[in-house]
């Protein structure tokens, strides 16, 4: 079990490329933290600095109150799982899982106990005598997890461990890793570019862009209360719809749209002196409904109708704006069809058009 403190962490390479900028985070014992962001945002570099595989250029890394900046990787009581399984093809599953313990000269009976315990948790008991070549991708990834588990480390680090798996296996392994966290009851830090993995697995999500932390929070918090337009657009699939306009009286207006703003949101906008200034309204696809209400109804034309099974994703044109609408599958929708859509303005978000920071 472990608590981590990352204080003003920096990573600057010799060519002066600033990869991680003033990273601050307190991780409590038994949390499942997910670093998420686009490629090149610094998430894997941060993970590698925690592991001791990258030198920290500035700031302090503390594990259980002890400064770890200069402590070798092998002495940090950390286990790591990589995107590449890195299994020894000539060894059995048992020997792959036991290899690190053998190198530490741990007693054979202890090794046997740990390997069998991990194999039981991961459903690998019947595969212990097989070699990696005889296993599926999901089974090989479980072996890699098992190799980390047997170390009984205080912190588990995972760097995009599911990215080599197909879509069905990724869903299955997401659930297995979440169950594993519950069984081990330990601190886990997980890196991914997939916001669905972040939303479904994390206790808290750390969203990064260009080496800078954009927001830290529980999945529901970052989804419902994004700190800025980047977070709002990155978290959620399909992404949040954005419309640029201004506030005129109690209306959000563009050249072709006029939508009534709820009183509580309007009060915040007035407090922030956002009236008559360029502003961005954001609204998620599920908060635009393909049915008419008393107000905030707009005519839309469907350009693409995607049936995913339980629902439709409707790609529409609304007054010159391209908007995605999430609709139930009870009705049929077709490209070229004109529909009336309703904006649930109680669910909309407003952002400063210049800074892109959330207003309300």
From Swiss-Prot:
GO MF term set? ABC-type transporter activity; ATP binding; ATP hydrolysis activity
Q: Does the keyword Thylakoid apply?
A: no
The family database entries (Pfam families) matched by this protein are listed as: ABC_tran (PF00005), OB_MalK (PF17912), TOBE (PF03459)
Q: Which GO terms describe its biological process?
A: carbohydrate transport
**Do the record's keywords include Nucleotide-binding?**
yes
Record's NCBIfam families? Answer: PRK11650.1
Would you tell me the protein name for this molecule?
Uncharacterized ABC transporter ATP-binding protein YcjV
Q: Which organism is it from?
A: Escherichia coli (strain UTI89 / UPEC)
């Amino acid at each position: 079990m472990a608590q981590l403190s990352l204080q003003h962490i920096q990573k600057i390479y010799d060519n002066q490329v600033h990869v991680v900028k003033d990273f601050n985070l307190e991780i409590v014992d038994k949390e499942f933290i997910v670093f998420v962001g686009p490629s090149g945002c610094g998430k894997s570099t941060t993970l590698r600095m925690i592991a001791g595989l990258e030198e920290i250029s500035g700031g302090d890394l503390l594990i259980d109150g002890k400064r770890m900046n200069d402590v070798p990787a092998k002495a940090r009581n950390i286990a790591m799982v990589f995107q590449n399984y890195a299994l020894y093809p000539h060894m059995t599953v048992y020997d792959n899982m036991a290899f690190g313990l053998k190198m530490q000269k741990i007693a054979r009976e202890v090794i046997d106990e740990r390997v069998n315990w991990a194999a039981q948790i991961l459903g690998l008991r019947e595969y212990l005598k097989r070699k990696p070549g005889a296993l599926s991708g999901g089974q090989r990834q479980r072996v890699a997890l098992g190799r980390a588990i047997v170390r009984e480390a205080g912190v588990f680090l995972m760097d995009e461990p599911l990215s080599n798996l197909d879509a069905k296996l990724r869903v299955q392994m997401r659930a297995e890793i979440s169950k594993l966290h519950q069984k081990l009851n330990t601190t886990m830090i997980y890196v991914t570019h997939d916001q669905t993995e972040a939303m479904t697995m994390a206790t808290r999500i750390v969203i990064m862009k260009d080496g800078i932390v954009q927001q830290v929070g529980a999945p529901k918090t970052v989804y419902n209360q994004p700190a800025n337009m980047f977070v709002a657009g990155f978290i959620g699939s399909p992404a949040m719809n954005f419309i640029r306009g201004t506030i005129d009286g109690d209306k959000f207006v563009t050249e072709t749209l006029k939508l009534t703003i709820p009183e509580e949101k309007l009060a915040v906008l007035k407090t922030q002196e956002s009236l008559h200034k360029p502003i961005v309204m954001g609204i998620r696809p599920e908060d635009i409904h393909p049915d008419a209400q008393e107000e905030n109804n707009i005519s839309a034309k469907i350009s693409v109708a995607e049936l995913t099974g339980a629902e439709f994703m409707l790609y529409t044109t609304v007054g010159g704006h391209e908007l995605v609408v999430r609709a139930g599958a009870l009705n049929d929708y077709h490209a070229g069809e004109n529909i009336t859509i309703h904006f649930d303005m109680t669910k909309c978000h407003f952002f400063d058009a210049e800074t892109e920071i959330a207003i309300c």
